From Swiss-Prot:
Its EC number is 2.8.1.10. One of its GO terms (molecular function) is thiazole synthase activity. Keywords: Cytoplasm, Schiff base, Thiamine biosynthesis, Transferase. Pfam families: ThiG (PF05690). Its main location: cytoplasm. GO terms for biological process: thiamine diphosphate biosynthetic process. 1-deoxy-D-xylulose 5-phosphate binds at residues 157, 183-184, 205-206. This is Thiazole synthase. Pathway: Cofactor biosynthesis; thiamine diphosphate biosynthesis. Catalyzes the rearrangement of 1-deoxy-D-xylulose 5-phosphate (DXP) to produce the thiazole phosphate moiety of thiamine. Sulfur is provided by the thiocarboxylate moiety of the carrier protein ThiS. In vitro, sulfur can be provided by H(2)S.
Amino acid sequence: MFKIGNLELQSRLLLGTGKFENEDVQTEAIKASETNVLTFAVRRMNLYDKNLPNPLANINLKDFITFPNTASAKTAEEAIRIAEIAKHAGVCDMIKVEVIGDDETLLPDPFETYEACKVLLERGYIVCPYISNDVVLAKRLEDLGVHAVMPLASPIGTGRGINNQLNLSYIIKNSNVPVIVDAGIGSPKDACHAMELGADGILLNTAVSGAKDPVKMAEAMKLGIHAGRLSYEAGRIPVKYTAQASSPTEGLGFL
């Protein structure tokens, strides 16, 4: 259990709700993950256009912390407008600020992200910005007052795992707010790795929804994240460059 702002998260797995084959698979995967935080793109909801489908219609959102994101925003102004739509619809316990700066890599725009966070904090939101693994930006956003930072492991949807372990480690080490690794996680191994580095949680979607068996993968991710956290808390042995026997050398005098 950990907190973002005044919200208590029962699970360190935050699950995206898009791209599932159907509602039944989505529901079973959510159940298997044991998450209590669901994230979704506001633009995919029927919050401002009732003619659009509601991909969360079969989910009782009262059982979850709702974590909408501002996906599709390319400016701070657009991100703020999307956040306001979610808030007025009553599905915004906290907001993931996602402002894309490049259409090919889908990397976040640091300048627009910062400006959006500044305004949303002034308006009383629990703000969690999605960022690249920029150590300086993470600290500047923390100084601004964000409630968590969400550095990517690798570009959205690539499943490449952690591309820059050094920078991610710096962000985790220097942060006084929760660090949620977001984007690029492809397997439970990737999720476990991020948690072993000391991340507070993992946000993922495609790794589960795109798996051959999303329900099993949701459970695997849950277990991988749990194992990684336990490993971090237990403290791994230091890496050495010479072999060291695990058996005692006493009692070998008779040889």
